[in-house]
Amino acid sequence: MAQKIRIKLKSYDYNLIDKSAEKIVQAVKNTKAVVSGPIPLPSKKEVYTVLRSPHVYKESREQFQLSTYKRLIDIYSNSSKTIDALMKLELPSGVEVSIKA
């Protein structure tokens, strides 16, 4: 039976996370492993409301939004080449990677 590796990616920038997911998929496919994904997970949006004025005018407010994007990649492999390829892979600093075997 093949070993299952689950990789979760998180980022505030969707372009960065898509490029990182593509790098991972390409590196794993070069080792002849089976890849499922990248699967887009629901994005989380946080909205922050602040007063524009430091003293009065409570009706005047400004809203800021912070979106967190997530992707899921499942890898099915028997070889150690796949794990070595993942360890040597360099990803941008704006992407959080969590790996479960």
Curated annotation (Swiss-Prot):
It comes from the Bacteria. InterPro entries: Ribosomal_uS10, Ribosomal_uS10_dom, Ribosomal_uS10_dom_sf. GO terms for molecular function: structural constituent of ribosome; tRNA binding. One of its GO terms (cellular component) is ribonucleoprotein complex. Gene3D superfamilies: Ribosomal protein S10 domain. It holds the Pfam family Ribosomal_S10. GO terms for biological process: translation. SMART domains: Ribosomal_S10. The keyword Ribosomal protein applies. Keywords: Ribonucleoprotein, Ribosomal protein. The keyword Ribosomal protein applies. Part of the 30S ribosomal subunit. Belongs to the universal ribosomal protein uS10 family. Involved in the binding of tRNA to the ribosomes. This is Small ribosomal subunit protein uS10. The gene is rpsJ.
